[in-house]
Amino acid sequence: MLDPNLLRNEPDAVAEKLARRGFKLDVDKLRALEERRKVLQVNTENLQAERNSRSKSIGQAKARGEDIEPLRLEVNKLGEELDAAKAELETLLAEIRDIALTIPNLPADEVPVGKDENDNVEVSRWGTPREFDFEIRDHVTLGEMHSGLDFAAAVKLTGSRFVVMKGQIARMHRALSQFMLDLHTEQHGYSENYVPYLVNHDTLYGTGQLPKFAGDLFHTRPLEEEADSSNYALIPTAEVPLTNLVRDEIIDEDQLPIKMTAHTPCFRSEAGSYGRDTRGLIRMHQFDKVEMVQIVRPEDSMAALEEMTGHAEKVLQLLGLPYRKIILCTGDMGFGACKTYDLEVWVPAQNTYREISSCSNVWDFQARRMQARCRSKSDKKTRLVHTLNGSGLAVGRTLVAVMENYQQADGRIEVPEVLRPYMNGLEYIG
């Protein structure tokens, strides 16, 4: 959520920055609501002061032995008017808040202006895509050769965009997540967390999934509605529970940065992606990811973004997977991000790079929703923290990249050296 004072006092400047990311802010409506808020605020305060004054008069009149009934009736009437004014003000404030919850974050000045993914800017490349002297098999073909990917079984169990992994392919999938966690915790300074896969609506509001992206989530619903039944949703990313661990907290600044990681399944409805990536593991309703989250001082967040992106890059480098780093343009950034780097790994069967990690600085956008603050050691004043999140990495897509980049002419899959300790020294699948 943007700073309400910024929306209130500098709506034109905010609108100009939001226009860079293709969002039209209704400045006239905001101004009208703000003028109405001021009127209602003054009216409410005046009624409160008048009621307090009249209430004191009752005691004074009673002490003088005067008839207090007219004053009592007047105070009661003022009370009714005050309650009505407060209710009207609360309704207006709720309307303003609802609008604020739909406004995306402001882009950082250095983010390239653009409409969509076609306007993203490549920053760098690492590694050289392998040249094959045989016909490339895609990961689906390789997985079926080794009885490791069973999409038909998943359709029977659940439906499309799910998979059953088996044997050494399932083992490599597990090895990848363990390798990523060990790297981030042992070398990059993150603490490992195990978090719930179901979260409540307050948690989803905190990180910005609600109210705007309710349709992208899988929501729980009792077979028979009960008055006390809780509303939960499956997490779309571990960013949601990890970041919300600091919700409503005041953290001493000398405790920052807080760096957390978790390996979880992620659940997404993939609304709007009909017909895209229907074959294989690239776009699933359920997929595993190792997530990185940092909670930092505001002045440290841009440096933290560079560091976090480097941590994700290290995973790819140790796996020997060619990739490119791009900075997303204003029109392609996520709702809460002010700046985002994507890492795209080389997928031989598609002869292109595909997203495997997204690392974002969110500034104080989530912290304001969560009321997550830090306290200065010198003057004890509090301020909102900055939050960052990044994939380190998407496990299923990493599996795709390993299977395809390490395939052999006979269909075997070489196991990258860094994964062999997690697979009992196995060198090849098949």
From Swiss-Prot:
Keywords tagged on the record: Aminoacyl-tRNA synthetase, ATP-binding, Cytoplasm, Ligase, Nucleotide-binding, Protein biosynthesis
Binding site for L-serine: 237-239, 291, 391
Catalytic activity: tRNA(Ser) + L-serine + ATP = L-seryl-tRNA(Ser) + AMP + diphosphate + H(+); tRNA(Sec) + L-serine + ATP = L-seryl-tRNA(Sec) + AMP + diphosphate + H(+)
Domain of life according to the entry: Bacteria
Pathway note: Aminoacyl-tRNA biosynthesis; selenocysteinyl-tRNA(Sec) biosynthesis; L-seryl-tRNA(Sec) from L-serine and tRNA(Sec): step 1/1
Annotated residues for binding of ATP: 268-270, 355-358
Localisation per UniProt entry: Cytoplasm
GO biological process: selenocysteine biosynthetic process; seryl-tRNA aminoacylation
GO cellular component terms given for this protein: cytoplasm
A molecular-function term among this protein's GO annotations: ATP binding
EC number: 6.1.1.11
Domain-level remarks: Consists of two distinct domains, a catalytic core and a N-terminal extension that is involved in tRNA binding.
PANTHER family associated with the record: SERINE--TRNA LIGASE, SERYL-TRNA SYNTHETASE
Quaternary structure, from the entry: Homodimer. The tRNA molecule binds across the dimer.
Family under the similarity heading: Belongs to the class-II aminoacyl-tRNA synthetase family. Type-1 seryl-tRNA synthetase subfamily.
Annotated NCBIfam families: serS
Function: Catalyzes the attachment of serine to tRNA(Ser). Is also able to aminoacylate tRNA(Sec) with serine, to form the misacylated tRNA L-seryl-tRNA(Sec), which will be further converted into selenocysteinyl-tRNA(Sec).
UniProt xrefs under HAMAP family: Ser_tRNA_synth_type1
Protein name per UniProt: Serine--tRNA ligase
Organism: Salmonella heidelberg (strain SL476)
